[in-house]
């Protein structure tokens, strides 16, 4: 079984975006610790399955981050299930999770399921609007959510999601300071190796996504930058 506590760098691929076979091979053989497949826009069972089947040709762990139960397909190494702690709608905290377990609980291996405590901090991103997230949070609010995730909910991952914009590195640093066992993931706005290296000094895992599609060569450089910093 894969141990997320040993990860430092993750590439996140969107099933709704185009990537060539050559680029996918380079991503999968880059030295990243995992490939995370997920998104919030036009993600379907078909495009998830198509992308997963290509990633599975390589040895890198392949993970599905579930945003709707319609996208759940077998064959992944792990299934990340976000609970959006700062959502104002109960569906995104536990409701959709119950529905997924009702439909797929008998079919899934519980050892493959990894819950994530998500805090979305970019009010303009699609994920924030979809989940009705309260993004008007200060550092103390986020640190409190981190403590809830680790000590009350016993979640293995706490994910700070800025989704498309670079986050507050001081907030990441302060959040990490209150976590002991829960792994801190950071995602959002990483456009170059220097930014990846900076955030890797505070987050346990840096997730790199959009730059794959905007500046592929720079995306590849983030792997060594994160590993060097960690």
UniProtKB/Swiss-Prot annotation:
Pathway the protein takes part in: Membrane lipid metabolism; glycerophospholipid metabolism
Coiled-coil regions listed in the entry: none
Annotated positions binding sn-glycerol 1-phosphate: 12, 159-164, 189, 209-210
Keywords associated with the record: Lipid biosynthesis, Lipid metabolism, Magnesium, Metal-binding, Phospholipid biosynthesis, Phospholipid metabolism, Transferase
Entry-linked Pfam families: PcrB
Residues annotated to bind Mg(2+): 14, 40
Cofactor(s) it depends on: Mg(2+)
Signal peptide: none
UniProt EC number: 2.5.1.n9
InterPro entries in alphabetical order: GGGP/HepGP_synthase_I, GGGP/HepGP_synthase_sf, GGGP_HepGP_synthase
Enzyme type, top EC level: transferase
Superkingdom of this protein's organism: Bacteria
Catalysed reaction, written as an equation: sn-glycerol 1-phosphate + all-trans-heptaprenyl diphosphate = 3-heptaprenyl-sn-glycero-1-phosphate + diphosphate
Molecular function GO labels: heptaprenylglyceryl phosphate synthase activity; magnesium ion binding
GO terms, biological process: glycerophospholipid biosynthetic process
Known partners and oligomeric status: Homodimer.
Protein task: Prenyltransferase that catalyzes in vivo the transfer of the heptaprenyl moiety of heptaprenyl pyrophosphate (HepPP; 35 carbon atoms) to the C3 hydroxyl of sn-glycerol-1-phosphate (G1P), producing heptaprenylglyceryl phosphate (HepGP). This reaction is an ether-bond-formation step in the biosynthesis of archaea-type G1P-based membrane lipids found in Bacillales.
Family label: Belongs to the GGGP/HepGP synthase family. Group I subfamily.
Protein name from the UniProt record: Heptaprenylglyceryl phosphate synthase
């Amino acid at each position: 079984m894969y141990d997320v506590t040993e990860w430092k760098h993750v590439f996140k691929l969107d099933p709704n975006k185009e990537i060539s076979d050559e680029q996918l091979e380079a991503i999968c053989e880059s030295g990243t610790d995992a490939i995370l497949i997920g998104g919030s826009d036009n993600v379907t069972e078909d495009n998830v399955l198509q992308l997963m089947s290509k990633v599975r040709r390589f040895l890198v762990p392949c993970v599905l981050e579930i945003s709707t139960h319609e996208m759940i397909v077998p064959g992944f190494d792990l299934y990340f299930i976000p609970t959006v702690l700062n959502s104002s709608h109960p569906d995104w905290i536990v409701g959709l999770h119950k529905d997924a377990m009702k439909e797929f609980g008998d079919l899934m291996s519980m050892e493959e399921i990894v819950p994530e405590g998500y805090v979305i901090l970019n009010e303009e991103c699609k994920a924030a609007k979809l989940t009705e997230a309260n993004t008007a949070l200060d550092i103390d609010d986020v640190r409190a959510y981190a403590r809830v995730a680790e000590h009350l909910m016993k979640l293995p991952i706490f994910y700070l999601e800025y989704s498309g914009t670079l986050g507050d590195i001081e907030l990441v640093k302060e959040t990490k300071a209150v976590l002991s066992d829960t792994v801190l993931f950071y995602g959002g706005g990483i456009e170059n190796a220097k930014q990846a290296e900076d955030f890797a000094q505070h987050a346990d895992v840096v997730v790199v996504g959009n730059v794959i599609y905007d500046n592929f060569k720079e995306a590849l450089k983030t792997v060594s930058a994160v590993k060097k910093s960690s």
